[in-house]
UniProtKB/Swiss-Prot annotation:
Belongs to the histone H3 family. The modification N6-methyllysine is found at residues 5, 10, 19, 24, 28, 37-38, 57, 65. Residues 1-43 are annotated as: Disordered. The gene is H3Y2. The modification 5-glutamyl dopamine is found at residue 6. The nucleosome is a histone octamer containing two molecules each of H2A, H2B, H3 and H4 assembled in one H3-H4 heterotetramer and two H2A-H2B heterodimers. The octamer wraps approximately 147 bp of DNA. The modification Phosphoserine is found at residues 58, 87. Residues 1-16 have a biased composition (Low complexity). The lineage of its organism: Eukaryota, Metazoa, Chordata, Craniata, Vertebrata. This is Histone H3.X. The modification N6-(beta-hydroxybutyryl)lysine is found at residues 5, 10, 19, 24, 28, 57. The modification N6-(2-hydroxyisobutyryl)lysine is found at residues 5, 10, 19, 24, 28, 37, 57, 65.
Amino acid sequence: MARTKQTARKATAWQAPRKPLATKAARKRASPTGGIKKPHRYKPGTLALREIRKYQKSTQLLLRKLPFQRLVREIAQAISPDLRFQSAAIGALQEASEAYLVQLFEDTNLCAIHARRVTIMPRDMQLARRLRGEGAGEPTLLGNLAL
């Protein structure tokens, strides 16, 4: 058994004796952080790029089906209270909506890059819509609804 350093002190009834100090060799082997391993961290942007590649490869819908369905029904309720939808119709609406949004965000990103930025801003989206001929400032059906 390896020898350890001991300190001389008077033992009292209310104090428990302390553990012996570690030897020099044991102290050298122990890491300064106490042996706790830090979790691996990727460089900023690495995970974002991985996520972009993942979603560009996939063909699945990006929006959840039930929240989208509730939104469609809520908007339709404001127009006509007794509308009913087939599930295929809501699926087609979701496909078209997601295709529109993805294309809009691509155009918005191009507008931000044109302005020598990497962060998209509302003005980029307004410019993208204006260039498409949709009109950024025009009130839409969604803009008139109190959602």
